[in-house]
Amino acid sequence: VRRHGTRLHHISTDEVYGDLEIGEPRRFQPGDPYIPSSPYSSSKGASDLLVRAWVRSFGVEATISNCSNNYGPYQHIEKFIPRTITNLIDGIRPRVYGTGEQVRDWIHVLDHNTAVWDIINKGRMGETYLIGANGEKNNLEVTQMILAEFGRSADDFDHVNDRPGHDQRYAIDNSKLVEETGWAPSFKDFAAGLHDTVE
């Protein structure tokens, strides 16, 4: 990057901030401390800090973004939404971990892409931007929306034991991104984006 004078953008996750209590109004802010709760989020946090060190120590022209949960067509089936969809296609009842009350802030992948593009073109060097589309839904609600897309009953799923250390809620305050770049999501209606994904 330094040798070629290349602009660097590092894409990360909101999981570096830990999780929030269900029902509280607070959302993650760019200056929040890192409190990762898994090996994955710890490694992502470490990579963010490495980029910040490159900026400070070597003057690398870089920005960082921490994004909420992506969804959209052709996502890898290990993820929650495509796994639920493919299970229904294959005749397998979807599974919901624990009560399903865990909240995620969903963003369509195309909106994530345009946000990154705007940061690359309009963002300030050395800054961190949080990408989210104000799409908070709990996992039970998302499962039932997918079931409805398939014409299935809202209770046509199985509850399974919750995962150890399952984060409760993610929510992004995207105001810095919006104010500095003018970005806005195209998929403001999660139901429409979910329908697009299923189709």
What are these regions (language model features)?
Residues 1-37:
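Conserved Rossmann-fold NAD(P)-dependent oxidoreductase catalytic core, especially the SDR/UDP-sugar
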Residues 3, 19, 35-63, 88-89:
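Active-site Tyr-X1-5-Lys
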Residues 7, 61-63, 127:
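Structural signature of beta-strand start/N-cap positions in the alpha/beta core
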Residues 9-11, 65, 84:
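Hydrophobic structural elements of the Rossmann-like NAD(P)H-binding subdomain
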Residues 17-18, 35-39, 63-80:
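Flexible, glycine-rich beta-alpha linker
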Residues 51, 84, 177-178:
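Structural element of the ATP-grasp superfamily
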Residues 62-64, 95-96:
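Conserved active-site beta-strand element of glycosyltransferases/polysaccharide synthases
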Residues 88-199:
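C-terminal substrate-binding subdomain of Rossmann-fold SDR/epimerase-dehydratase oxidoreductases
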